[in-house]
C-alpha cells in the first residue's frame, strides 16, 4: 500500500462540543499541558465559544485553539453569532465549519461554504466537514452525498485558500454512536474524496490537502486508521475530553516514551458524544 505523503503533516483536532464547566475545562487544559505530545502532529482543540478565551490564555503554545462554528458575515446585527473578526481578535486560529450537528439545523452546502470562505478571507484556518447518513452508506451512495459538499467548498476557495483548509470526513452514522468505519471503509472514502478533489480543485490541491477521519475515533482504533495512506489525522469528539486524547495525538510516533502522564482525572466522564 502507498504510504501517506510526508508533505501532509498529521493533524488531530479535538471538538469538545457543548460540554464542560469552568472547572472541567481547566482540568482538561491542565491535562493537555502536562502530556508529552509529539511535535510531528498538528493539534487543535475546539472548546465551546464561552470558554475560548480562557483556554487560549492557559493552553500550551504548541496546541492551537479553534471555534466550533463561525458566522458567514462580519460584525453587525446578528444576534447569537460569532464573527471571524471576533475570533481572530482573541487569537483563535481555527474554526470548524459544516459539522453534521450544524447541518441538521438547516445549513445548506452553500451556506457552509460561505462560512468557510469568509473565515479564510479573515485569516482563520478551517476544518471543513463532510459526511453521509447511514442510509447512503447502506445504499452505496456515499459519494453522491459527500461530493456535493466538497464541490461547494471547491466553488468558493482559490488555490491559495486551500493551504488554510483541512477536510474532515465524518460519517454521520458514526458520530457519537460508538460505530466506526472500518479502516478499509474510511480509506476508500478518503481516497475517493482526494480523487474528486483533484477533479474540482486540481491535482496539487488534492495531494497537499489533509483529510481527517471523524466518527468515534479513539485511542484504540486510531493507530490502524492512521496507517492508511489517505487518512491524515482525526477530528475527535468524545475521546478529546479524556486523557486518551494524548494517545490519539501520539498514535503516529514510534517513541514509546511519549505517553500521557497520570494527572489523576478521568476527563469529563460520560458526558458528551
Language model features: what each stretch is:
Residues 261-273:
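Glycine-rich adenosine-cofactor-binding loop
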Residues 2-257:
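Active-site loop-to-helix "anion-binding N-cap" substructures in soluble metabolic enzymes
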Amino acid at each position: 500500500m502507498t504510504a501517506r505523503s510526508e508533505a501532509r503533516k498529521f493533524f488531530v483536532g479535538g471538538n469538545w462540543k457543548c460540554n464542560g464547566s469552568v472547572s472541567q475545562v481547566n482540568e482538561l487544559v491542565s491535562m493537555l499541558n502536562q502530556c508529552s505530545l509529539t511535535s510531528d502532529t498538528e493539534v487543535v482543540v475546539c472548546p465551546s465559544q464561552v470558554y475560548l478565551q480562557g483556554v487560549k490564555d492557559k493552553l500550551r503554545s504548541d496546541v492551537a485553539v479553534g471555534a466550533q462554528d463561525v458566522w458567514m458575515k462580519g460584525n453587525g446585527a446578528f444576534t447569537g453569532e460569532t464573527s471571524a473578526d471576533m475570533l481572530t481578535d482573541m487569537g483563535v486560529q481555527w474554526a470548524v465549519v459544516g459539522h453534521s450537528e450544524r447541518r441538521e439545523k438547516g445549513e445548506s452546502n452553500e451556506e457552509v461554504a460561505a462560512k468557510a470562505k469568509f473565515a479564510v478571507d479573515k485569516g482563520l484556518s478551517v476544518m471543513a466537514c463532510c459526511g453521509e447518513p447511514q442510509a447512503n452508506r447502506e445504499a452505496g451512495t456515499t459519494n453522491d452525498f459527500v461530493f456535493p459538499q466538497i464541490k461547494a467548498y471547491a466553488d468558493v476557495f482559490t488555490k491559495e485558500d486551500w493551504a488554510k483548509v483541512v477536510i474532515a470526513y465524518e460519517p454521520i452514522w458514526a458520530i457519537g454512536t460508538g460505530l466506526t468505519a472500518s479502516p478499509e471503509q474510511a480509506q476508500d472514502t478518503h481516497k475517493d474524496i482526494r480523487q474528486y478533489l483533484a477533479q474540482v480543485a486540481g491535482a496539487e490541491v488534492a495531494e497537499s490537502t489533509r483529510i481527517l477521519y471523524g466518527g468515534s475515533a479513539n485511542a484504540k482504533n486510531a493507530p490502524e486508521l492512521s496507517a492508511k495512506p489517505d487518512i491524515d489525522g482525526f477530528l475527535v469528539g468524545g475521546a478529546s475530553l479524556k486523557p486518551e486524547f494524548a494517545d490519539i495525538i501520539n498514535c503516529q510516533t514510534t517513541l514509546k516514551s511519549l505517553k500521557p502522564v497520570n494527572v489523576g482525572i478521568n476527563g469529563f466522564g460520560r458526558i458528551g458524544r
